[in-house]
């Protein structure tokens, strides 16, 4: 009896010991696997990994964002109507643009600088920082900024005027993106930046000749890249025609973007400061203008302001004027006849019916565009 009891106790101890050894062995293996996993570089399960999931509370929808989504980029030389364009798109319930990020053109310019320097290119390649690595990092950075600096929406757009100096590169990073290149009479753009003291890197605001020369160089760079990616990806939008005939141009533009028509794009001024509407910056120079409905008040303000010697040499100083369809010697120019509604809007603007709302009243800083 005692012998049988000892035998049972011995068997029980053996079973317990076996289970304990098995458990400890399994635990050790799990720890080893976890250590190995942590030592491996992080891998994305999906090459189209979502940067952000945004929730539209009102519509009870969740949106996911990735590099293959149909992003919209608005650009051009500053003072060419880029803010008006983004405000009109922002009024659409399915589109969110938001204020200028300012960081996007700077990081793109940095990437261009690295690419142009053969010595720097060799150094980066030797360090394993290849074009593929940089492009992947740029995709993630740009998308993160575009997505997270505003509210979620089915369609996202970015408006940083000089970002389109890297238009072909952006088209490669985001294969389904569309580009809107805002074009304006260079004489009007330059007069606006000089009279409103909008400092732009490289532009001498004391010289119409210098500013027109720099305007010509900048718009030529963006225009050539727009032509390179083709009409299916890039659309030229003449500021003058947009303000003269907004409905015609917005219908054409939304069709180009494959976004359904919505009448609210013609009344962006009614959506300012509203949820899901147009968010404006207190420090951007165009804010006091886009609070007003589309009007023709700014079209010919440059007439009589440009020095005679510059006017005489205009075709040589700014050959892109003629290429874009402007008469370099027309003074004043004839941009066309506005729609009746625009004439009414302009009359109301001149009467002073539209004033800067209190929540936007803050003295603007000196704005510099790079």
UniProtKB/Swiss-Prot annotation:
One Gene Ontology cellular component annotation held by this UniProt entry: Golgi membrane
The transmembrane residues are: 9-25
According to the record, glycans are attached at 60, 262
Q: In this chain's numbering, which residues are marked as the site (Transition state stabilizer)?
A: 159, 286
Which cysteine pairs make disulfide bonds? Answer: 97-157, 226-234
Catalytic activity of the protein: L-tyrosyl-[protein] + 3'-phosphoadenylyl sulfate = O-sulfo-L-tyrosine-[protein] + adenosine 3',5'-bisphosphate + H(+)
Q: Which InterPro entries match?
A: P-loop_NTPase (IPR027417), TPST-like (IPR026634)
Q: What is this protein called?
A: Protein-tyrosine sulfotransferase 1
């Amino acid at each position: 009896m005692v012998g049988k009891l000892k035998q049972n106790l011995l068997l029980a101890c053996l079973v317990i010991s076996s289970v304990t050894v098995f458990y400890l062995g399994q635990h050790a293996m799990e720890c080893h696997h976890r250590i190995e996993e942590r030592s491996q570089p992080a891998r994305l399960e999906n090459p189209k990994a979502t940067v952000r999931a945004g929730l539209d509370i009102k519509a009870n929808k969740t949106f996911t964002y990735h590099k293959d989504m149909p992003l919209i980029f608005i650009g051009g030389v500053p003072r060419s109507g880029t803010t008006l364009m983004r405000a009109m798109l922002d009024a659409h319930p399915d589109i969110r643009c938001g204020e200028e990020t300012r960081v996007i053109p700077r990081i793109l310019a940095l990437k261009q600088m690295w690419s142009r320097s053969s010595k720097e290119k060799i150094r980066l390649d030797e360090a394993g920082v290849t074009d593929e690595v940089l492009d992947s990092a740029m995709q993630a950075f740009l998308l993160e900024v575009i997505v997270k600096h505003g509210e979620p929406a089915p369609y996202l757009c970015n408006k940083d005027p000089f970002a389109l100096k890297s238009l072909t590169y952006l088209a490669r990073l985001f294969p389904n993106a569309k580009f809107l290149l805002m074009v304006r009479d260079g004489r009007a753009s330059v007069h606006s930046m000089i009279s409103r003291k909008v400092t732009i890197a490289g532009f001498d605001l004391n010289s119409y000749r210098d500013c027109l020369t720099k305007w010509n160089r900048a718009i030529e760079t963006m225009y050539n890249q727009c032509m390179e990616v083709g009409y299916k990806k890039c659309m030229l939008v003449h500021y003058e025609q947009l303000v003269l005939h907004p409905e015609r141009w917005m219908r054409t533009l939304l069709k180009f973007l494959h976004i359904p028509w919505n009448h609210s794009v013609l009344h962006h001024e009614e959506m300012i400061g509203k949820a899901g509407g147009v968010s404006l910056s207190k420090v951007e120079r165009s804010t006091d203008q886009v609070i007003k409905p589309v009007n023709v008040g700014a079209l010919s303000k440059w007439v009589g302001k440009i020095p005679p010697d510059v006017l005489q040499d205009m075709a040589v100083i700014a050959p892109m004027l003629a290429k874009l369809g402007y008469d370099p010697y027309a003074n004043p120019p004839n941009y066309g006849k506005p729609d009746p509604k625009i004439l009414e809007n302009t009359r109301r603007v001149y009467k002073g019916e539209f004033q800067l709302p209190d929540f936007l009243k803050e003295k603007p800083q000196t704005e510099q565009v790079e």
